[in-house]
């Protein structure tokens, strides 16, 4: 029986949920995600090269936008500049010999706006000096930033080679413009979106199968069992991933992003701890294909034998509703041109004004899982993020809205963290951020047929 102290704690800590509290089998109303097959490798290469050419065509405009006349990138095999991966052809698996690129904002005398070399002799430097002498760029950007990976990919040894190769006369014209690398990598051309949406649907479909009675056997399956099932499932579909899937049992303790000091005492993903009836489980999961990466976090609930949606603890459903509200808050504050730190500040102020406790840690995604762009909070940095948080939010990119809300669950007599992560894209038609596939608004339910003599406990 729920005592008066527990009830009072619930009333003080609970967030008012205006919508009707429900739970269903699916993740989002009206959506039944299906695995989307990838095209042949040859067709994938055509798609990739087409997207790359679209993006390369944007470079002269980027140079003009940031007031730079030329952009020079150079790398050796297995020591690539980070931006190299946004420029390479689909059938290139690394740089070769010395791979060098020069881009010009406004070439003179009908010259091309870009040049590339794959060379292991002095020819590259001789020809490069000739082009620079003809074009006379006043500024030449190099990717030498010390804090931003997408603007700091020029290796130290290669920088020495560049300075020696082009000569001291050009050294004074070298400049650092970090937004060149950031914006080039961040920009997602429109033709990529349909495939990104298919990839996201596939990720949802794998999660829904993994968090179902098809895969989870209560009392037997462990979190690690489900993680490796997900990994094998990805591989079987000819997709890959950019991180190991994780599955956590949300007990109210031990969730890493919550910085809970009791984590060592209550490991939510201990390999020998089976998933049990009544568990609230969470996954962080992504798939990779076609030079793109997804990033998703969903939660599910393990019903007791014979239970239905109506038996899900209401506090858990309310927790999901609360984190949905936090998603709305962050998405509405993501104004193009604002810095990540400004968005973080506005979002946290609104979050607290609505009585929500949680954390916000959003990042760009797409080309890389943690891709180029501003950062909106980190799990350990909720006031501001140095350097990365000071970058402006760009349009025409993808973002992972990653966060959690805390909610007191009276049926467990404890506060539980409710994490969520969904990807969004910039939509020019609505001038706003839209979910790539959707967002989780209903708990995933793991069902078990009724067992004679077994009933769910009334108190946990």
PLM segments and residue spans:
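Fungal secretory targeting signals
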Residues: 1-20
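Active-site neighborhoods and metal-handling regions in enzymes and metal-associated proteins
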Residues: 20-460
């Amino acid at each position: 029986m729920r005592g008066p102290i527990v009830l009072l704690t619930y009333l003080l800590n609970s967030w008012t949920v205006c919508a009707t509290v429900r739970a269903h089998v699916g993740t989002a109303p009206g959506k039944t995600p299906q695995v989307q097959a990838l095209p042949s490798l040859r067709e994938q290469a055509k798609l990739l090269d087409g997207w790359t050419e679209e993006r390369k065509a944007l470079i002269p405009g980027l140079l003009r936008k940031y007031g730079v006349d030329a952009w020079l990138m150079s790398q050796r095999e297995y020591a690539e500049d980070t931006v190299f991966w946004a420029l390479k052809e689909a059938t290139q698996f690394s740089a070769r010999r010395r791979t060098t690129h020069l881009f010009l904002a406004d070439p003179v005398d009908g010259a091309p706006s870009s040049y590339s070399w794959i060379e292991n002799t002095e020819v590259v430097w001789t020809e490069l000096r000739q082009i620079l002498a003809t074009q006379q760029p006043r500024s030449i950007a190099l990717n030498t930033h010390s804090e931003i990976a997408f603007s700091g990919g020029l290796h130290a040894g290669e920088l020495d080679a560049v300075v020696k190769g082009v000569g001291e006369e050009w050294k004074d014209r070298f400049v650092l413009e970090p937004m060149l690398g950031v914006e080039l990598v961040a920009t997602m051309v429109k033709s990529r979106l349909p495939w990104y949406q298919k990839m996201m649907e596939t990720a949802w479909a794998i999660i829904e199968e993994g968090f179902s009675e098809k895969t989870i056997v209560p009392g037997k399956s462990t979190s690690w069992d489900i993680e490796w099932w997900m990994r094998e499932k990805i591989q079987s579909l000819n997709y890959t991933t950019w991180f190991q899937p994780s599955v956590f049992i949300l007990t109210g303790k031990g969730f890493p992003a919550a910085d809970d000091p009791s984590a060592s005492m209550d490991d939510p993903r201990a390999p020998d701890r089976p998933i049990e009836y009544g568990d609230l489980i969470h996954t962080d999961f992504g798939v990779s294909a076609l030079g793109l990466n997804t990033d998703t976090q969903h939660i599910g609930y393990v019903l007791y034998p014979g239970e239905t949606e109506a038996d899900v603890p209401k506090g858990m459903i309310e927790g999901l509703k609360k984190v949905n509200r936090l998603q709305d808050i962050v998405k509405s504050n993501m104004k193009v041109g604002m810095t990540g730190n400004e968005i973080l500040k506005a979002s946290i102020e609104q979050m607290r004004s609505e009585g929500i406790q949680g954390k916000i840690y959003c990042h760009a995604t797409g080309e890389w899982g943690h891709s180029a762009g501003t950062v909106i909070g980190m799990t350990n940095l909720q006031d501001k993020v140095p350097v990365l948080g000071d970058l402006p939010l760009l349009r025409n990119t993808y973002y992972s809205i990653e966060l959690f809300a805390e909610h007191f669950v009276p049926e467990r007599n404890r506060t539980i963290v409710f994490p969520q992560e969904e990807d969004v894209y910039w939509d020019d038609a609505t001038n706003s951020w839209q979910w790539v596939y959707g967002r989780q608004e209903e708990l995933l339910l793991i069902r078990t047929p009724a067992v004679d003599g077994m009933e769910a406990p009334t108190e946990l």
